[in-house]
Amino acid sequence: MKLAASFLLMLLEVLLLPETPLSAEEALASTPGSPLSSTEYERFFALLTPTWKAETTCRLRATHGCRNPTLVQLDQYENHGLVPDGAVCSDLPYASWFESFCQFAQYRCSNHVYYAKRVRCSQPVSILSPNTLKEVESSAEVPLTSVTTPIVSRATATEHQAFQPWPERLNNNVEELLQSSLSLGGKEQQSSRKLGLEQQHKQEQIQEHKLEEAQEQEEQEEEEEEEEAKQEEGQGTEEGLDSVSRLQSDSEPKFQSKSLSSNPSFFTPRVREVESAPLMMENIQELIRSAQEMDEMNELYDDSWRSQSTGSLQQLPHTETLMVLCYSIMENTCTMTPTAKAWSYMEEEILGFGDSVCDNLGRRHTAACPLCAFCSLKLEQCHSEASVLRQQCDASHKIPFISPLLSAQSISTGNQAKIPEKGRFAGLEMYGGLSSEFWCNRLALKGCEDDRVANWLKAEFLSFQDGDLPTKICDTNYVQYPNYCSFKSQQCLLKNQNRKMSRMKCMLNEKYHVLSPAKGEEVILRWSQEFNTLTLGQFG
């Protein structure tokens, strides 16, 4: 690990050498928080070539996370000095955006795409970044007389409701709801035109300010103190009126630009300007209602429709809306889309189906990740020509199922599980956008009590509940473990030795070698020791 750290320090020394002066166009593109240009990325990646150099940085990121001071400097360089705290976009066709730059960096490492680039997003990312909508809304409410004061986002009661952590309200604009595949295009050019207007507006304001200062100085030299006081008072009033009239006549994007410029934290790609202040909605029901009104259907989406619904997609009140929803989850990674989150919320909370997902074919969709079961059902419904209906889960739904369509989707971030064999579960291939190898390594380094490790263990444990004793933990070697951490440590240890072992359902009619809590601790320690031995062997 010392080798990795020393290599990164040398890398930073090279990166931070004085550069040749930038042209005006390059200087404009190098706004803090913006991605590197193609030329800048060539220079950046040249220092991470051959791949062992990139792998070295990835090992450090895997063990220390994105907050490691050395990695923070590296990430700052890749973002012109400021790591964005919202959603970012990439040049990967199958993983076009990520919820954070850290997630993007970890994805590059875990999937060995070391030279993937961060790019400017082709459309506003307000729907991708959980906090952006609140910040833009609060910026629009700043009084005109306090334009230059830092913007403070206001916490509202809705921020603590069950719709967290994604935005509580969705834009009724269909393009906002979908991802980049539904973009109508042209917004990048519009953003460029707006940026030019904003720069011109700022220059005009600076020139006006200089002229006003020169006039004040001349008046102070020519007139007596009493007359100066009167003129300064009159001039102050006139300037105040002029500034108010200028603000009122300016377009909204200019006002937002000036407001955001006073707060450095807003210089991130996630603050892409929306064409106008969006009309927000409480949930996906409002989208359906809006679509009905546009078609002059005038029938309210009310309890009578809900009580008649059996979960069939064909019974949704608006066909075009249904097509939009299906297109969104099929063209993108379903488990990551805001569409799936809103749709799931509507069915679970409003229609009352609850968390479990079953259909009329007797299948119980496997919850390998928070939205996996729901997306498995919806992909089947959207793609299948047969009538697939959602039903309340009961004893008749005995067939564990996960749609092959879900497994086939490219999981850019989030969790991914193999289709489980009957009565067996190998574990999550991906969790939080990171591979199982990463989590095994972190388990060995940080232990079971680490918050991130604990969440991973909990997610895996809850992903497989089968057998006569679903809360017990048994493996395919007929060993029963006192806790999931000891089981996972043993699985990581065997996997490192190229041996396979899976979790298996615990049955009453089977005999198992039951480990005591003390033996379980020994298993955990054994994996930690083996990993540390391997690490010391690699890095000296």
From Swiss-Prot:
Positions with biased composition (Polar residues): 256-266
Keywords from the UniProt entry: Cytoplasmic vesicle, Phosphoprotein, Signal
InterPro entries: Proacrosin-bd
Prosegment location in residue numbers: 25-272
Highest taxon of the lineage: Eukaryota
One matching Pfam family: PBP_sp32
Signal peptide: 1-24
UniProt function note: Acrosomal protein that maintains proacrosin (pro-ACR) as an enzymatically inactive zymogen in the acrosome. Involved also in the acrosome formation.
Protein name, entry field: Acrosin-binding protein
